[in-house]
């Protein structure tokens, strides 16, 4: 993404050329938009709870606060593996989830039988989720990629709290809803298996984006 910001700066410098400015009709505004990737989900949820933001993505939040109200056309760019590519492929939409397991702490060597291992619950949940993958249609392009952001506090203590974050992506809204329900079911199953509790917070992400082919005049200008 550092390269994308460099591209914005390069475009701004190019548009200061007097010959270029003569050909422009209107005004050009440059946005350095944060939070495209929608990471750090729990942190963003805390900002939402505080009323500081409503959406976890930079473009969504800028739209909400009116930053694009007087914009007629926007041009975005992204790094890729080609010298130049005009237009875009369709993009998955997604919801974000924070999964919090609560167990019971105990000494991992002296009395593990007195504890409820939240990390074991999370491991079972991840395994259950993996077994859902064959139920996803290829055409729906479902992608679910969780991470563990908190796995325990001390190595000699049975973990009593484990936190995961994940995005649930798919190419259409029905597929997102289906995959999200299966994700919840899998993670809750892990909690049931070991007697832990499971709390899942789901937040809206992006809707699927359907792209049209680039206009011929745009392709010619890009050349």
Enumerate the predicted regions with their spans.
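Acidic/histidine-rich catalytic neighborhood of metal-dependent amide-processing enzymes
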Residues: 6-90
């Amino acid at each position: 993404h550092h390269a994308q910001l460099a591209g914005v700066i390069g475009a701004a410098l190019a548009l200061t050329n007097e010959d270029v400015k003569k050909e422009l009709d209107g005004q050009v505004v440059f946005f350095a938009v944060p939070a495209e990737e929608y990471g750090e989900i729990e942190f963003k949820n805390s900002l939402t709870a505080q009323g500081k933001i409503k959406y976890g993505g930079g473009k969504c939040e800028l739209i909400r606060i009116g930053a694009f109200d007087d914009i007629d056309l926007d041009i975005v760019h992204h790094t890729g593996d080609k010298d130049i590519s005009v237009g875009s492929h369709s993009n998955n939409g997604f919801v974000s989830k924070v999964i919090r397991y609560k167990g019971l702490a105990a000494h991992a060597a002296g009395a593990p039988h007195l504890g409820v291992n939240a990390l074991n619950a999370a491991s079972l949940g991840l395994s259950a989720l993996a077994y859902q993958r064959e139920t996803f249609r290829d055409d729906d392009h479902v992608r679910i990629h969780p991470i563990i952001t908190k796995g325990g506090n001390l190595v000699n203590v049975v973990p009593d709290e484990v936190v995961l974050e994940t995005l649930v992506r798919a190419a259409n809204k029905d597929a997102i809803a289906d995959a999200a329900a299966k994700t919840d079911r899998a993670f809750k199953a892990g909690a049931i298996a070991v007697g832990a509790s499971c709390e899942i917070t789901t937040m809206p992400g992006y809707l699927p984006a359907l792209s049209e082919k680039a206009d011929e005049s745009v392709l010619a200008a890009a050349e």
